[in-house]
C-alpha cells in the first residue's frame, strides 16, 4: 500500500535483502505466460489461466534444484510414476502422481484425483500461492498414518514426506500392500504388538527427515 512508499525503502531492500530484490516485480505472467493468450479462450466453458507443474517454471528464479534433479522424484519415466497412474488408479495417485498429491492436499474427493503421469516437481509439494505454512508447503506439521489412521503432530516440514513414505497394511480382500518405510519406523508407531517392549529408535530425539535429506 501507499504506507510502504517511504524514501529509502528500495535502497534498504537492495542493500540488506539482495535475494528479495532479485525477486521484485514477479507478476502473474512470469509463471502463467503472456496474458495475450487469454482472449483466445473467450467463450470457453472453463476459462482458466495456463498452469504448469514443470520444474522449469520455478527454475526461472529458484536455482536450488540440483538435489531434486538427482532424486527419483524428478524422474517422470520411472516406474513409480508410470505404473500406478492412469484411469482406475485414484487410490494410488495421492503418492504416485503429482496432480494426485495436490488434489489430496487440497481436500479433493479421492474419486476426483487427477490420474495423469506427473513427477513430483516443485509445485507439487510447495503451493506457489499460499504462504500459510513455512516454505509454502501444502502439508505441514500433521499427518494421518495410513492403515491405522493414526494422527501424528509436531512433524514440521517432515509431514510432507510422511504422507507417502509409510507402509500400507495388507487388506483382507487383496490389493497391493506396501512394506513399511521411514515414517512409522522413525516414530516407533503404527506397527504390530508382540508382547515385548522395544526401545524407540534414537532418531526420534534427533532432527527429523528433512534435516537429513533436504
Model-predicted regions and their roles:
Residues 1-214:
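Short sequence/structural segments immediately N-terminal
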Amino acid at each position: 500500500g501507499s504506507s510502504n512508499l517511504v524514501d529509502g525503502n528500495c535502497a534498504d531492500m537492495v542493500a540488506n535483502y539482495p535475494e528479495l530484490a532479485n525477486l521484485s516485480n514477479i507478476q502473474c505472467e512470469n509463471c502463467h505466460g503472456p496474458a495475450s493468450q487469454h482472449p483466445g479462450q473467450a467463450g470457453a466453458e472453463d476459462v482458466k489461466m495456463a498452469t504448469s507443474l514443470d520444474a522449469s517454471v520455478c527454475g526461472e528464479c529458484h536455482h536450488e534444484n540440483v538435489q531434486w534433479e538427482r532424486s527419483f522424484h524428478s524422474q517422470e519415466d520411472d516406474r513409480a510414476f508410470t505404473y500406478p497412474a492412469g484411469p482406475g488408479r485414484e487410490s494410488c495417485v495421492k503418492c504416485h502422481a503429482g496432480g494426485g498429491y495436490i488434489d489430496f492436499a487440497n481436500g479433493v474427493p479421492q474419486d476426483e484425483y487427477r490420474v495423469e503421469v506427473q513427477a513430483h516437481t516443485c509445485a507439487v509439494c510447495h503451493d506457489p500461492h499460499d504462504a500459510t505454512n513455512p516454505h509454502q508447503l501444502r502439508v505441514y506439521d500433521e499427518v494421518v498414518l495410513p492403515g491405522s489412521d493414526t494422527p501424528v503432530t509436531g512433524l514440521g516440514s517432515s509431514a510432507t514426506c510422511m504422507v507417502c513414505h509409510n507402509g500400507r497394511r495388507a487388506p483382507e480382500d487383496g490389493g497391493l500392500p506396501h512394506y513399511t518405510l521411514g515414517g512409522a519406523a522413525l516414530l516407533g508407531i503404527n506397527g504390530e504388538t508382540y508382547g515385548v517392549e522395544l526401545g524407540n529408535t534414537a532418531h526420534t530425539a534427533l532432527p527429523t527427515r528433512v534435516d537429513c535429506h533436504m
